């Protein structure tokens, strides 16, 4: 048995990372320490005045582990890795795990292209971003392609020059046709360098060039060309207006501010590139309002910059953060150049930080209003559920199940969880049928519930660390009527459980209409909050099942399609799908884009391109 007080005496006087676990062996907190002995002992001192969240965490700790490292920076990096791996309950977690989009100009190619990417590499290309929205990137790229008549096809230049006829875009004067020699390599590259200067914020140069061309065309009485150039100037001005200059030094910065109400914390990030705000992002941390802001910001920065691929030279903060020197060293190592963390005291930066903080406050207010509306629906819906079904109390954990299949193939099930009336996405589970070989909703539902509940039994008996099925439902909802409910009840009772089970029945138009419970069917009126609540659960369960089914079908299609290509094995297939997301995108990619994928050489890229083209 783990004796916490005895183990505290054994802690070393060194830097490292500590891992707190509960009675089930689940990791509930990960932290780092300059001196492990001092930091970990602080948690268990009765005189310590810990915030409520820390007190709750300590009350759950049954054992701890630690890992010794050589430096604070190593400890910080390991802490970030373990938080990402375990997603501990009591750590501040970023729910958004996306990679931000960038605009990439492939100056490393003879005929550069402009494209969207989510990977920044040292490959000789120029990258601009990050942008907070893929739509913003697509709009900018589309505008630039129209303004500069760039090629949009996947022809490999200079290899394909003169091999095919010019496309429709050329005849519509929307492409310079480098594939036909309509513009030579040096001219095309110079134009792409202009685009890079444009993306870097140097709009005036391009506008002046276009204005000179417009005036020349007008003097030569070529009014059609002059009008086209005038329209281009207008488009560039409109695009530049969306990225106002804030700083004349044209530095890259991230501005981080925050706002908190009585319960929640909102952190907002403004991305400043070349002196212009190109985007922003916000993060809501529920229940974190009372945390020390230095700790909260420090934790956020470590997680946020673990995920992003580009780190600016300066990070401007609303207030001081814990471990600022260590974080700056880590970010400097990550970027390869010096990164500074700065809390401004005067000047324009103070005004901008205040603006970011105000935006965080507005975002938090809107979040609270939306929560209030949703909470009303959920709380009223839950109250009606309790009354309608005659339950003793509101179910704290609802598990909802649905089946999805394409004929007799790719039969899958989803398990969606709502805790205290709200979706708990980290608790969602997906199942691929093992014993069902043809369409059979009842059999599929029974297999799903058997595997889910049997796994829970096994985890409890074996004391599984980081158990994923140990939490049990207060109410099970199945997509269907009385037959589905009976099929589910049979499995539940066979395994020795006595959960409440209800069916979510739909009408002929596939809309939620009633609940089936204990042999009775309860119609749900259209104005009932309960109908909106059950519909939300049913739609979410259906969405997860359908998306999983689609993903498996895509994998099967990939196997049959990509297996025909020489040099493509399992590892390369996975890498291609991870990068492009679909076979359709792979089919459209050119050789250079294919080579961006890990493990895809020029030879393999040519094999793929030639197979599809």
Swiss-Prot record:
It is found in: Cytoplasm. InterPro entries: GIY-YIG_endonuc, GIY-YIG_endonuc_sf, GIY-YIG_UvrC_Cho, Hlx-hairpin-Hlx_DNA-bd_motif, RuvA_2-like, UVR_dom, UVR_dom_sf, UvrABC_protein_C. One of its GO terms (biological process) is nucleotide-excision repair. PROSITE patterns: GIY_YIG, UVR, UVRC. Residues 13-92 form the GIY-YIG domain. Residues 204-239 form the UVR domain. One of its GO terms (molecular function) is DNA binding. The keyword DNA damage applies. Keywords: Cytoplasm, DNA damage, DNA excision, DNA repair, Excision nuclease, SOS response. It comes from the Bacteria. It holds the Pfam family HHH_5. GO terms for cellular component: cytoplasm; excinuclease repair complex. Belongs to the UvrC family. The UvrABC repair system catalyzes the recognition and processing of DNA lesions. UvrC both incises the 5' and 3' sides of the lesion. The N-terminal half is responsible for the 3' incision and the C-terminal half is responsible for the 5' incision. Interacts with UvrB in an incision complex. This is UvrABC system protein C. It comes from Ruminiclostridium cellulolyticum (strain ATCC 35319 / DSM 5812 / JCM 6584 / H10) (Clostridium cellulolyticum). The lineage of its organism: Bacteria, Bacillati, Bacillota, Clostridia, Eubacteriales.
């Amino acid at each position: 048995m783990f004796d916490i007080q005895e183990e505290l005496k054994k802690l070393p006087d060194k830097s490292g990372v500590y891992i707190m676990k509960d009675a089930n062996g689940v990791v509930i907190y990960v932290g780092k320490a300059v001196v492990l002995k001092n930091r970990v002992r602080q948690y268990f001192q009765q005189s310590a005045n810990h915030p409520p969240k820390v007190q709750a965490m300590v009350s759950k700790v049954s054992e701890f582990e630690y890992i010794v490292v050589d430096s604070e920076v190593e400890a910080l990096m390991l802490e970030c890795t373990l938080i990402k791996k375990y997603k501990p309950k009591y750590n501040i977690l970023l729910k958004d795990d996306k990679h931000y989009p960038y605009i990439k100009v492939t100056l490393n190619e003879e005929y550069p292209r402009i494209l969207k990417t989510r990977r920044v590499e040292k490959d000789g290309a120029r990258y601009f971003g990050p942008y907070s929205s893929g739509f913003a990137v697509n709009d900018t790229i589309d505008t630039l392609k129209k303004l500069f008549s760039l090629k949009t096809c996947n022809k490999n230049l200079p290899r394909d020059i003169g091999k095919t006829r010019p496309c429709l875009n050329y005849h519509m004067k929307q492409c310079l046709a480098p594939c036909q020699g309509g513009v030579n390599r040096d001219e095309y590259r110079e134009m792409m360098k202009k685009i890079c200067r444009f993306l870097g914020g140097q709009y005036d140069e391009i506008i002046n060039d276009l204005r000179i061309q417009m005036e020349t065309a007008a003097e030569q009485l070529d009014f059609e060309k002059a009008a086209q150039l005038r329209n281009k100037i207008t488009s560039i001005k409109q695009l530049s207006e969306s990225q106002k200059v804030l700083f004349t030094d044209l530095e890259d910065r991230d501005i981080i501010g925050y706002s908190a109400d009585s319960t929640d914390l909102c952190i907002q990030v403004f991305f400043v590139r070349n002196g212009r705000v190109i985007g922003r992002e916000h993060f809501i941390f529920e229940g974190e309002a009372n945390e020390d802001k230095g700790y909260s910001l420090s934790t956020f920065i470590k997680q946020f910059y673990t995920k992003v691929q580009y780190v600016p030279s300066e990070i401007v903060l609303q207030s001081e953060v814990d471990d600022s020197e260590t974080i700056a060293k880590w970010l400097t190592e990550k970027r390869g150049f010096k990164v500074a963390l700065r809390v401004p005291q005067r000047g324009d930066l103070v005004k901008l930080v205040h603006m970011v903080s105000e935006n965080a406050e507005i975002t938090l207010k809107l979040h609270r209003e939306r929560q209030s509306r949703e909470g009303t629906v959920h709380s009223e819906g839950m109250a009606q559920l309790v009354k309608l079904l005659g339950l003793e109390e509101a179910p704290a954990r609802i598990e909802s199940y649905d089946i999805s299949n394409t004929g007799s193939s790719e039969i899958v099930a989803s398990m969606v969880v709502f805790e205290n009336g709200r979706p708990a996405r980290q608790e969602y589970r997906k199942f691929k049928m093992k014993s069902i070989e043809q369409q059979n909703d009842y059999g599929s539902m029974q297999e799903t519930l058997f595997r889910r509940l049997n796994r829970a039994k096994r985890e409890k008996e074996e004391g599984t660390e980081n158990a994923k099925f140990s939490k049990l439902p207060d109410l099970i909802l199945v997509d269907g009527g009385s037959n589905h409910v009976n099929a589910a009840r049979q499995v539940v009772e066979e395994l020795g459980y006595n959960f409440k089970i209800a069916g979510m029945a739909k009408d002929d138009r596939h809309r939620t209409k009633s609940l089936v419970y204990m042999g009775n069917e309860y119609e749900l009126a259209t104005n009932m909050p309960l109908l909106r609540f059950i519909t939300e659960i049913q739609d979410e369960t259906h969405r997860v099942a359908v998306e999983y089914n689609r993903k498996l079908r895509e994998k099967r299609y990939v196997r049959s399609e990509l297996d025909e290509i020489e040099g493509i094995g399992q590892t390369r297939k996975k890498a291609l799908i991870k990068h492009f997301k679909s076979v359709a995108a792979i089919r459209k990619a050119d050789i250079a884009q294919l080579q961006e994928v890990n493990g895809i050489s020029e030879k393999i890229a040519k094999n793929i391109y030639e197979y599809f083209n």
